């Protein structure tokens, strides 16, 4: 019976680890041509999709729903059907709303600091007279790793390949808004592709 008593605690100890693995969300988008909101320039196709609902957010971020906290994730898929490598390291993307206002993307590392509570640390301190160890700690709803791991990070895109990831905007989504993208270059010549202006169709 002793081996049995030793086995039970071991199973209990390992159970949380297995539970955590089950909660991991694997994300893979559909082929670029399957998205209604897309545009093709010079044999390069870009598709975009706003993740504004809880169901959509669940497929990419698990329990996290960024739009609930004022952050709109926009999935961007780039399909390179040219015979040249594309440089994406200077890609510029803006959200154009129904009023014509252009909103810059919020860097993934800055997203947690857009909600009330945490402040980005600075060399001069944060101005709060209460010592950090005495402050009441609140869990940041946007402080998990999903925001950064899902962010668009590709710097180069080989021929006949695709890259995808999320850009984050402090914007209110409406169908008819659009995504403006430029500064995609041909790596060999440095020539910039024509800009993309992609309206949301859903």
Predicted ranges, named:
Residues 19-202:
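Conserved functional micro-motifs across diverse proteins
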Residues 9-10, 165:
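Small side chains
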């Amino acid at each position: 019976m002793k081996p049995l008593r030793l086995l039970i605690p071991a199973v209990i100890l390992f159970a949380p680890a297995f539970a955590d693995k089950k909660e991991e969300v694997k994300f893979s988008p559909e082929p670029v041509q399957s998205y209604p909101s897309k545009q093709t320039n010079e044999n390069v196709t870009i598709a975009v999709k706003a993740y504004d609902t809880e169901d959509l957010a669940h497929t990419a971020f698990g329990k996290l729903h960024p739009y609930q906290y004022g952050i709109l994730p926009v999935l961007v898929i780039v399909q390179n059907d040219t015979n040249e490598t594309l440089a994406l390291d200077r890609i510029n993307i803006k959200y154009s709303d129904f009023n014509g206002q252009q909103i810059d993307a919020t860097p993934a590392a800055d997203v947690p600091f857009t909600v009330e509570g945490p402040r980005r640390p600075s060399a001069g301190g944060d101005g709060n007279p209460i010592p950090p160890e005495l402050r009441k700690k609140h869990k940041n709803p946007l402080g998990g790793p999903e925001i950064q791991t899902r962010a668009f990070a590709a710097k180069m895109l080989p021929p006949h390949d695709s890259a995808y990831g999320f850009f984050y905007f402090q914007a209110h989504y409406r169908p008819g808004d659009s995504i403006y993208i430029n500064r995609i270059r041909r790596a060999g010549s440095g020539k910039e592709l024509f800009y993309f202006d992609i309206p949301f169709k859903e």
